[in-house]
Amino acid sequence: MARAMCGRRSILGLALASAFAFIGLAVAPASLAAAETVRVGIVGGEDEDVWKVVAQQAAKSGLTVKTVVFNDYTQPNEALERGDVDANAFQHKPYLDNQIKTRGYHIVPVGFTAVWPIGLYSHKRHSVADLPKGAIIGVPNDPSNEGRALIVLQSVGLIKLRDGSGILATTADIVANPKDVKIKELDAGVVGRSIDDLDAAVVNTDWALKSGLKPDTDRIAQEPLADNPYRNFIAVKAGHENDAWVKTLVAAYQNDAVKDALAKAYHGTGVPAW
């Protein structure tokens, strides 16, 4: 990843780790005082299988988890802000920060889940070196994931970003493009399905799998895991961080049964982040 990113990533990682450590000081109770049901917003697909296991783990502590499935990245936060769900689990900190800035949400992270390294995929090329001059490369068009995609392209030498452009870099921050690649901005859910119309595409793992892409054979590059700021987490409305059910929910996710479920559902591409 870009050398300029290391400091900000480390600071972000430490800040989040500290916040979650503080939340974790109170051990999750063996059972809740009364049976309680919580609604958790997730994005449909492989994560539905993972959350079935989370629900089983939560039930052991008296917490009933009902998932509410959405089909894009905007709805889960809208629903959480309105109170239509009690928590959600689908996003990383750069995405939430941008949503708070642009939409004024009152949402906070409470526990890490997993990280899905974003990858560069192609049906036409077998390596980055095979990409021709003028190659058309698709990237997600939402601010946080576009910056993430551009950093991947920089990490493999396809472009260079302006120093200090950070994790919210845009195409306007490209200062060198030796192969004259053409960046095509598409909705995160569309970019993977457009792979046959592109030379390559940077696709989030969940959307890659939904689009029929195979990380083992179609992925020609991926972002590093070290100091990765894109760890996903469970989030709740501000003011509920220390509710007993929140601690129970986080504990229900952060265990070996869910590690196994992640490995099975995502074929090793979903890496536990706690």
Regions found by a protein language model. Name each.
Residues N98-V110, K124-R125, D197, V202, ...:
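Ligand-binding "clamshell"
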